[in-house]
Amino acid sequence: MYKYFLQGLRIGVISNLFLLWASLTIANISNDLFLVVPAIILISVSAFRCLFPVNYASKSVIIDSVLSSVFVTRFLVTIVEVTYIYMFSYVLRIINSDQYMFVDLISWLMVIQVIISQFFCWGAILLKYERFYFYEEFGWFVIFFINTILSIAMISLDLSNAHHSLIIINIVFGALYLPWQVLHLKSITKRINTNDEIKAQEFDMDLSKVKFEFKSSINDRKVSFDSNDWGGL
């Protein structure tokens, strides 16, 4: 059953490529490169990840290719996560239009936090210290908590219909995402506390270990459709 679910991700390749094509040809996209470029990167990398998914912890893949490697995926994801969170914060500042100074200032915390989360994720991979995944994911809770709170703060402003719709979408997304992320953080905590291998891991900045894990992130992978290798159901 899980095998079909993973293979079904390929549908996402088609939908994302269609969205990319529509964005570039049909939709009346903005000329603002700070909006357009992050959006194109996000859609393109989303299509790539649907075709070459990988689980960072188990290094499980569905296509045995270097393109499925943890390193390649994480490198692309680092770029896309920083750029699209910048885009989110940029949109908040556009909507705010200098009305609330605290919105402009706090929106930059989203960008700072996503950069911090990247360090935790790369630390988990290159130092083989999987506890860092918790702090990476906690960072995402912080990011979208800020996004939601700032959106609520701006809902009473005199906004255009388009901007008001974006604010509502932000709030609804936050209302759905934040409780789910709390459950996700609890599942990560449970995995850390019940997995003897993770509990045995030590924080070690040894350069030889970093080199070894770097090579492992490129070369090591296993084709698996076992739900346990993908974080379970």
Over which residues does each language-model region extend?
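Internal transmembrane alpha-helix with an interfacial aromatic "cap," most often the third helix
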Residues: 21-27, 48-57, 76-107, 115-125, ...
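Membrane-interfacial loop-to-transmembrane alpha-helix junctions, especially the N-terminal start
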Residues: 29-41, 98-111, 161-169
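Lipid-exposed faces of alpha-helical membrane segments in multi-pass integral membrane proteins
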Residues: 37-48, 79-82, 109-116, 142, ...
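Helix-loop junctions on the outward
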Residues: 44-72
